Amino acid sequence: MFYNLNTMICVVHMTEELSNTFRKYTQLVKMLPKKPCDEDLLLLYGYYKQVYNGNCNIGEPNAFFGIKEHRKWRAWKSVENMDSSLAMNKYIQKVNQLIESYK
C-alpha cells in the first residue's frame, strides 16, 4: 500500500487547524454577550462530549432524579457515531450562528 506523503501532511495540518479552531471556539462561547438558551447549550455540550469522549459510554440517567443530567445525556447520545471532525465543525457553526444572532 502506498501513501502520498504530501496528502498525509495536508490532512494532519487540516486536522490540527480544525482542532485549534475548535479549542478557540470553546473559549469564545464563554465570552458571548449573553448566555445561550438551554437548547443551544445542550447541542454544544453534545458536540463537545462527542469530540473529547466519542460515543456516549454511560447508561441513561433516571430523569426523575436529575432532569439536567438526563438532558445532557440525551444531547450527547443524539450525536452518537458522529465523526469528531464533523462534531467540531458543527460546534463551530453553531457558535457562529449564536454570534450572528447577537448582532
Segments (PLM) and residue ranges:
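N-terminal alpha-helical modules
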Residues: 2, 8-103
